[in-house]
Amino acid sequence: WDQHGKTMESWNQGGLTYYRIAGPLVPTLFVNQFAYLEAAGAAPLYAKVTESTGKTAVLRTLKEYTHAKNSVWGVTARNREQNFALNLLLDPECDFVTLTGTAATGKTLMTLAAALSQVMDDRRYTEIIVTRVTVPVGEDIGYLPGNEEEKMNPWMGALDDNLEVLSRSDGGAGEWGRAATNDLVRSKIKIKSMAFMRGRTFLNKFLIIDEAQ
């Protein structure tokens, strides 16, 4: 702030605070990049770059998904990076998000929670399409019977595991309520094979590519 706050402008919009800053780091900032300041004795600042002209940049504070009141389908961010990820996944102006990290860091869980929130609650998209490359870890199990979705099931264990976590997050729904919710959720999720995607056009869909590497 000592270097970038001298000519700073700030304003509030939609419950979030915006800062227009100028300084030596501004030329290195790009849109949708996150900036944070964690100083001893002061409240931390977490923000996303929404505009960058080279001389000035606009930062917007984030919605804090680390708080239970802002949980997404029962999922709360456990750390700074997960909070950044949820802010991107739930931003309707951000069309393409890639998440990278070690195993068991919540990438698929957060993405699925964000997708369900925007399909079931906000009605922003009509359904969720999930796909991944069908590369076996060990020996190939050969030809699989069934339709496209049934053939994909052996590779969708992580999806099923995360759906189970999300359906159990509604503790007050009871067993019948959770079963009904689970059936409704699954009706909004379509599993597609990448082998048959060439030439397809998906309109108003939330597309998840798991294990994209």
Task: Kindly label every feature range from the protein language model.
Residues 1-66:
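Interdomain "pre-motor" coupling segment immediately N-terminal to P-loop NTPase/helicase cores
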Residues 74-93:
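N-terminal pre-P-loop "Q-motif" helix
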Residues 91, 120-123, 198-201:
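Conserved catalytic network of the ASCE P-loop NTPase/AAA+ motor domain
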Residues 93-98, 204:
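Pre-Walker A (Motif I) flank of P-loop NTPase domains
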Residues 99-101, 111:
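Hydrophobic anchor at the beta1->P-loop junction of P-loop NTPases
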Residues 102-103, 133:
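P-loop (Walker A) phosphate-binding loop of NTP-binding proteins
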Residues 109-183:
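Conserved P-loop
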Residues 185-213:
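Conserved RecA-like ASCE ATPase "motif II neighborhood" in helicase/translocase motors
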